[in-house]
Amino acid sequence: MRKNFGPKSWLYPMPVLIVGTYNEKGEPNVMNAAWGGIYDTNQVMVCLAHEHKTTENIKKTGAFTLSFATAETVAECDYVGIVSANDVPDKFARAGFHHVKSNFVNAPIIAELPMTVECNLIKFNEDGICIGEIVNVCAKEEILSEKGQIDAKKLDPITYDSSTHIYWRLGDAAGKAFSEGKKIK
């Protein structure tokens, strides 16, 4: 038996992406965006309303960063999603965030968030879909495995459950991609 819910925007997991930009004065801005992910090879997409300060900044600078919210930074990352830079221009600092300028794009890397995807704007359509070219991915060494790869367990990213409005941690590994299915004959 199944229960029908009708049309809902429920996909699991939904990464909690923290979008970083600079304004026209070179000051950092940041917002929380749960609707985003990979768009194509070396491309990301994130849904942003046109009235966001972040949207204005991306259109002006042509660049942005996406960082993954973590369990350790859940309060700060939630804060930048519930407060608008149009109303609280210094919300980046109020969240306790610090930044360094990306070496690859005109956007900030948030020091407190361990993994960042650095992007140049490809296009921003009238529906609020922002598509960016991935120019670089950087990560703090403490979240790398012994093989030098990003370790999801060490990253400890949170995901957003839009049906309950809860942030969740990822669980344990369930299997190896492109390998588990080979067991079926």
Positions of predicted regions on the chain:
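Basic, polyanion-binding surface patches
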Residues: 1-185
